[in-house]
Amino acid sequence: MTTQVPPSALLPLNPEQLARLQAATTDLTPTQLAWVSGYFWGVLNQQPAALAATPAPAAEMPGITIISASQTGNARRVAEALRDDLLAAKLNVKLVNAGDYKFKQIASEKLLIVVTSTQGEGEPPEEAVALHKFLFSKKAPKLENTAFAVFSLGDSSYEFFCQSGKDFDSKLAELGGERLLDRVDADVEYQAAASEWRARVVDALKSRAPVAAPSQSVATGAVNEIHTSPYSKDAPLVASLSVNQKITGRNSEKDVRHIEIDLGDSGLRYQPGDALGVWYQNDPALVKELVELLWLKGDEPVTVEGKTLPLNEALQWHFELTVNTANIVENYATLTRSETLLPLVGDKAKLQHYAATTPIVDMVRFSPAQLDAEALINLLRPLTPRLYSIASSQAEVENEVHVTVGVVRYDVEGRARAGGASSFLADRVEEEGEVRVFIEHNDNFRLPANPETPVIMIGPGTGIAPFRAFMQQRAADEAPGKNWLFFGNPHFTEDFLYQVEWQRYVKDGVLTRIDLAWSRDQKEKVYVQDKLREQGAELWRWINDGAHIYVCGDANRMAKDVEQALLEVIAEFGGMDTEAADEFLSELRVERRYQRDVY
């Protein structure tokens, strides 16, 4: 287990002290880490000044609860920053991860703040699914004594923009809650909106919440576990790419790469279940094509975050070029008065369809216009890092991190196009080349604390990545618990990712069972959800034996189909109706026995 400092905080340790602390705690169990935390707290509080302080009972200080519901870490960072702002204002605040929130307590909340992102087709983040389901159930209590505010993060390139935040906001009001502030829906470039909203929240709460004594101004909850690393999304580690290996066959329709990155002596730590954030640069050839289509030269000066840069450099390093959005299409149409695009303006569905099927460079190619450099920059969104599920355990690979990358490649009317980050890693970073990375910790996708607990892993395609990390960790720990893998892809001969490794784990007895679904090797398509139904009786036995279930991969189709198959298995072999099966699976989620890493 690792410990986590809010990204905005400055570590009070020098690199040598940090390395010693990490070395001393790297092999401790969660229970041992909790004891060590208490031990150091006790040492600190043996100081005379501390002994003299007598804090008032917490029960006398009804305060503010912040619920963080994050998928990629952005919502968590906003929640942590708000927590810090409220502490600075001497307000009593508790910050809790949505997955750890005892949602039956919600009726007793007086001041409630929800910071949430949205995933998939307007769904809440994985860690907030149980809370969301509870609030929308008949069990949800009235909240007449609760004042609340919601900050929602989303991406306007998706149809259900900020839907999770809209859901929480409307439901809390419907249950009788009082809005402290109107909901804020923030797009990808959320920082300015978040900063303004945080200031408004602090002002609104100062008049409602009691000021806490210094000893009471503390935040609790899983969000506040400390991950000791000086590296973050905003301060990434410059690492080097050491291995770039294609692991699909020459006749495969997919290009999947096994990527290994050398972390050197950085001390960067991660756990199985975490994600690797990768900052990439756009393809110079794509930048050149876009610039020339707009009759620009590329050396025009533009302003980016207060700095003056040549247009080419700004486009390569700072702006999103490979993902189009409805807003970009609409703004480009209005700006250029394009006869092709103007009819789409005002029709959300048509704009979204066009954006989803037409990259920015092809939009310009099909509807040419002349823009000045600043107008182009103002049209685009800032470049954001991509997250990849980590496919390794440091118990085996030490100062390396591995990821499994499905390279996005497609044609648009004869022009080859590719994904920004995936093609950067696959095509443009040379061996030993620099890659800027950071760890996005995911405490909602963790191996069981008890090594004897059985594990069921469901991961078709590149969803196999975290389970490679899981197996490395289980093997290194010599964990006696059983392990069962469900994997699927189009063809056995071309698409069996990490085949030799899985076969070795089976031979060594580490992988107890493996079920494989090859969707294109026979007339009828077979998927992992079909294998789940086929093995329903045994699956139910494992669940009854306390197994933890993990799902990784596509959120929109696979994860939903897998969940439906699990519900059917639970209903059939558990003798339950549909409603009871759904309740059973929800309880597994609350108990952290059903965890998903979907995207």
From Swiss-Prot:
EC number of this enzyme: 1.8.1.2
This protein's UniProt keywords: Amino-acid biosynthesis, Cysteine biosynthesis, Electron transport, FAD, Flavoprotein, FMN, NADP, Oxidoreductase, Transport
UniProt GO cellular component terms: cytosol
Enzyme class of the recorded protein, top EC level: oxidoreductase
Positions of the FAD-binding FR-type domain: 234-448
Entry superkingdom: Bacteria
Keyword Transport: yes
Function: Component of the sulfite reductase complex that catalyzes the 6-electron reduction of sulfite to sulfide. This is one of several activities required for the biosynthesis of L-cysteine from sulfate. The flavoprotein component catalyzes the electron flow from NADPH -> FAD -> FMN to the hemoprotein component.
Name of this chain's protein: Sulfite reductase [NADPH] flavoprotein alpha-component
Organism: Escherichia coli O139:H28 (strain E24377A / ETEC)
Name of the gene this protein is made from: cysJ
